[in-house]
UniProtKB/Swiss-Prot annotation:
GO aspect biological process, one term: mRNA catabolic process
Taxonomic source organism: Rickettsia conorii (strain ATCC VR-613 / Malish 7)
Domain S1 motif residue range list: 623-691
Domain KH: 554-613
The protein's name: Polyribonucleotide nucleotidyltransferase
Binding-site residues for Mg(2+), renumbered to this chain: 487, 493
Amino acid sequence: MFNEITKSVTWNGQVLELSTGKIARQADGAVTVKMGNSVLLCTAVVANKAKEGIGFLPLTINYREMAYAAGKIPGGFFKHEGKASDREVLVSRLIDRPIRPLFHPAFVNETHVTCSVLSYDPETPVDILAIIGASAALSLSPAPYLEIVAASKVGLINGEFVLNPTLALLKTSQLDLVVAGTSDSVMMVESEAHLLSEEQMLEAVKFGFESFQPVIKIIKELAEEAKKPKLEMQALYPASLKKEIEKLFVKEIEQAFAIKSKQERSTNLDLIPEKVLTHFVSDIENKKYSNYQIESALKAIESDILRNEILEKNRRIDGRSTTDIRQIACEIGLLPSAHGSALFTRGETQSLVSTTFGTSLDEQIVDSLEGEYKERFMLNYIFPPYSVNEAMPMKAPSRREVGHGKLAWRAINPILPNKVQFPYSIRVVAETTESNGSSSMATVCGSSLALMYAGVPIKAPVAGIAMGLVKEGKNFAVLSDILGDEDYFGDMDFKVAGTSEGITALQMDIKISGVDFKIMKVALEQARLGRLHILEQMNKVISKPNNELSKNAPSTTTIKIDKDKIRDIIGPGGKIIKEICETSGAKIDISDDGTVSVYASDRDKLKVALDKIKAIVVEPEIGEIFNGTVVKVLDSGAFINYVGNKDGFVHISEVSGERIETVSSVLKQGDIVKVKLIGFDNKGKAKLTIKNADKDKSSNNTKPKTNVNNTNKDNSEPEQRRDSSKKRAWNEDNNAETAEVITERKYFN
């Protein structure tokens, strides 16, 4: 019934298996990928008819993580996989980027690739398996897929490169890098790094590139046995058509490209296609040429003009040389109500960035196959249509916005303080207000400025730069700080972010058949020089974090309590913690390890909440004086609430220095009286006295004294505490960063 074909290779100590012919047999290409306990189904479907006139490859990649793959039921009301998560979007883009450039340039058939995780093993990198499976499925399909791609993940642990590190290993790694390519060249790089040098990054890419070559071999073997006939492709346009357009319109195109302003240049270039189509109207009517062929030939001429100017004259369309950076302007604190803000402008690209602090309750909860976890740092990239003067409605975040936001997140995350050093959650919103190339790197620069102005103690300022490439044969030019047109007509988009000491993020996308390591080395060094120049301009405005947080930022403190006191703060059904939050206006977050974080809009509210918590968790010392409230009067005495939610008993003999007939003749419910703690009974209940308490010189407080040895009312040896854990919950000897206020200088204003 099944004609299954399987190929396998031992890769990094695990067996990687690719098979076809058993599942999803009606798809044009279907491959099951297995490694460890991970199983993915990758399919490729190609439409029979071309979608002419669209000017781009209609390729859609969908990566899906099925909940059952990890033995889970989806959350939410419907208990069903819904819209793609950010993780699924990011992996979909990761698959798309190395694959898209490898189709025949004239191929415009609708193509859909789906990669579904059917079984999940945290010891294997499913995103890497998805890239491999998608490439294999396309190689089996009729799509004119010209090269075979594979990928690998690289970590750096204890100075050694690690192939396909597990999630546990990645937590200790200085590098998280994905590299994809063909047998000859690198096609895509995506990474987050902890201040690594250009040399280390290049060596990591080489390591990953060499590591996936055995995988390419088994994909080729599978394709040789199971592939379907490829679609026959024609040239995009006749060569004679291009020559005719050049002869008639090249001068006008060159004049338009000579305009330095993007908007004016675009306006003039947009007028040319209509003129060209009008000239060839009879040929279109006679079906000698199609609109799509004419427009494609015109785009090729525009590309030739831009590329020749760069390669032959070292001159770009805005007049810069290949290494020049556009003019930079930085401004901070322009949004008075934001916790931090900055405006970063580089040429005609501009990003308005704001920073907001929140509590641990505001952290992003992420539900993934690995399990549920929280993200303390959030970065949202917004690309509104007005930034490129387009009249379009605002929509939900696109895949591009999610991807650009994650790249900027990767660039900033390595230089952020940890939660002990800075207890807030952080949200950065970067709105691209103008765009002419490299808006994601403008986001990185603006985010660094806004964070420093907000007072976040980042390790160092971060800047980003986008590099381009124009390559013809062996001749090539690497471009610093590319424009939108240079990105569109160029061969590479290579984004590098980092500090003056090293790289924090790197992303490379190639539009040709690949680049070699010589080009990458030149691009990395040129990017380093450009990054240093940008940092120099940024440092003129702000070079280190402000010492004070914004007056609008919330106040916070973190204390450490005994774990057995957690339930006392929470109370039955959360009654106590709710009451504290409602009366103080603060927010409280309690961790399982006994860390209590308190947040409030101002210091007064913070103090109220903190005092209430202290009153609950402290262990009062014998001999302390308190202002107590009478809660119940009995014939034998009275119950007094003397601190927090703690009640003690005053025997009738301890109510007054004089003999009294009844307790009710002296005390009434609700009375405020001074009481002194004189000991505990055999059940651990507090014993109090009112006699002479108001004459004691000790003042009322809710913080216990240190090492106070008091005697009981009989002047005998000091009573033992109720149990061996009666040491104070409020431990003054705790580490300064985790006990009281974490650096009061910064977090209180």
